[in-house]
Each structure stands twice: as C-alpha cells, then as structure tokens.
Amino acid sequence: MTQFDKQYNSIIKDIINNGISDEEFDVRTKWDSDGTPAHTLSVMSKQMRFDNSEVPILTTKKVAWKTAIKELLWIWQLKSNDVTELNKMGVHIWDQWKQEDGTIGHAYGFQLGKKNRSLNGEKVDQVDYLLHQLKNNPSSRRHITMLWNPDDLDAMALTPCVYETQWYVKQGKLHLEVRARSNDMALGNPFNVFQYNVLQRMIAQVTGYELGEYIFNIGDCHVYTRHIDNLKIQMEREQFEAPELWINPEVKDFYNFTVDDFKLINYKHGDKLLFEVAV
C-alpha cells in the first residue's frame, strides 16, 4: 500500500458516505456524452501529505503518467495556453475546452508566462522569478505562484482547478504546498497530485535542494455520481508498492527537461478504469 493509495481511498470513502449532493442546483458541468447535468457528491477542505519517501501515484488503477508530465511541461515550462501545442505531444485532454483560436484563453500557462514581476530592473514571469528567488533568497516566505487572476477569469475557457503553489526552503530541503479550489477525485486528482510532485522534484534538482514535504490541499473535493460505481471497484483492488521515479540527473536547467528525462520504474498497477468526462 502506498501513501497515496491509503489517503486517496480514505477521502473517496468519506465523500461516498458523507458527501453532500448538488442535485438541488442547476449545475454548470454537463456530461460530455449526452449533455445532461453532471452532479456530484462533495466534501470541503481535504489535505493530502507526503514525506516524499515514495512518488505519489495510484496503484489501484493505471495513471497515464507521461501524459501528466506532458501537461505539466506545457503549463510550467512552455507557459502555453495553445491546445495545438499539447496535441503535438499526443495529448488531447484539453480538446473539449479549446476555443476558436485554438487556446484555452487566459488560463494556466498564459498566467505563468505573464512578465509581471520585477527582477534586477526588468520584468520576468512567475516561474523565472520563483527559480531566482529560491536560489538567491531562500528564507523568503513569499515563494508563491498564482494562476487565479481576477482580471482574466472571464477570458479563461476554464478557471484553474490547481491555482496556487507555495514553496518553503528549510534546512536545505525544498517543501511544496499546493492549493486546488476544486478536484474531481476520479480523473483530476490522480493527475494533479502526481504532476505537482514531479514539479517539486524538478525544481529541487535545478535549485540544488533536497526534497522536503509535499502537501496537497483541496477546497471542493468531489466525486461525480457516474463515477461512484467504478470508484467502489477501484477501492477494493489490490494495492502495490510505489514505483521509483527516475529523473535525469544531468539536467540542471528547468527549461531543458523533456518527457524523455523521466522514467517510472517498477510501476505495478490495476487495470485502467474508464470515467466519463464532465465539461
């Protein structure tokens, strides 16, 4: 049993047993297959904590880990909102939200690419500012990135689910706290928890720190009603030991990472489970 499997199953059980239904509301989300309202059971404010002795990835089902890393690189490294760039990587998870111009509007990578921080007399974006400050001002309590920009929310195809990171350097270790306003536990959470841990490992490597604690906070923690049956099946499955994530130690520049610089070794998992997408 992995740290992630244990915490994940605990949250799923809590939502199924104690979650509050939103069926009283005319909800925004619709099922992609038939356009009917996609309702949820939800609880508020859940936290997952990992000591980084193992990589947090589910073993009760197969997680498309390379796809998760490609999405991470698209947002954090390319700082892109262009869905066609993601399509070129063979990833189509954002196709349902693609606008006429081929982008997701002013969301995700667009926000990270804005040059809105002052550094040594010039403007830089949030990622470059974070990397510089972690190296040169590690004791700061202001190592934060933010994707929730009220000025741009109306210009986003989808407002960010994971919207904030806060980084701490203590005793030579890089700790990361992530905040998600909303998390679809069947589809979004396994991706997000894994990929932001990968981000922590990447940034620790290029800034010269050891790995510290990893904390993932969720505001609206929910399960879609059509996902419940398969989630119950998933929770009863055999759990395996956590795999090892290898990251190419030769990469010292954040912008030089490619998906080929990552290997998930001995990843044992249950069969893939299909969960319908709500948009």
From Swiss-Prot:
It comes from the Viruses. GO terms for biological process: dTMP biosynthetic process; dTTP biosynthetic process; methylation. The keyword Transferase applies. InterPro entries: Thymidate_synth/dCMP_Mease, Thymidate_synth/dCMP_Mease_dom, Thymidate_synth/dCMP_Mease_sf, Thymidylate_synthase, Thymidylate_synthase_AS. CDD domains: TS_Pyrimidine_HMase. Pathway: Pyrimidine metabolism; dTTP biosynthesis. Its EC number is 2.1.1.45. GO terms for molecular function: thymidylate synthase activity. Disulfide bonds: none annotated. The active site is at residue 161. Keywords: Methyltransferase, Nucleotide biosynthesis, Transferase. DUMP binds at residues 141-142, 181-184, 192, 222-224. (6R)-5,10-methylene-5,6,7,8-tetrahydrofolate binds at residues 184, 278. Provides the sole de novo source of dTMP for DNA biosynthesis. HAMAP family: Thymidy_synth_bact. PANTHER family: THYMIDYLATE SYNTHASE 1. This is Thymidylate synthase. The lineage of its organism: Viruses, Duplodnaviria, Heunggongvirae, Uroviricota, Caudoviricetes.
